[in-house]
């Protein structure tokens, strides 16, 4: 696991900085996903790296469902400025942006309300 295997070895290496590729294509509702993790798990992993207090460059990448990708990355940005995305509802401006997205996939035909109303998938 991340906290028991990867992070201790990373700390043994004592990096000056971390480059974190925060791809969103492993999220459960991504059409390319074979991993099926929630954005809670995604954010928990990002938080674990941020908690190391090592300078970090977070890069976006991967993510083929624009709704889940936008919400996941917004949550990462929130974490980086000290906000808690795990319970964050979308403000009207962000909801408007999400509602305007086009997702030409079977998952995009009848989008769930939660894709435009909140950042988190489920509690």
What is the role of each PLM region?
Residues 1-123:
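A general "terminal functional-core" signal
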């Amino acid at each position: 696991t991340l906290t028991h295997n990867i992070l201790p070895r990373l700390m043994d290496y004592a990096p000056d900085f971390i480059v974190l590729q925060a791809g969103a294509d492993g999220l459960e509702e991504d059409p390319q996903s074979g991993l099926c993790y929630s954005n809670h798990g995604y954010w928990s992993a990002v938080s674990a790296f941020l908690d190391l207090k090592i300078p970090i460059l977070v890069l976006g990448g991967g993510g083929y469902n624009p709704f889940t990708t936008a919400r996941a990355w917004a949550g990462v940005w929130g974490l980086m400025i000290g906000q808690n995305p795990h319970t964050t509802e979308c403000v009207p401006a962000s909801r408007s942006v999400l509602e305007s997205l086009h997702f030409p996939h079977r998952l995009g035909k009848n989008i769930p309300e939660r894709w435009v109303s909140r950042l988190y998938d489920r509690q």
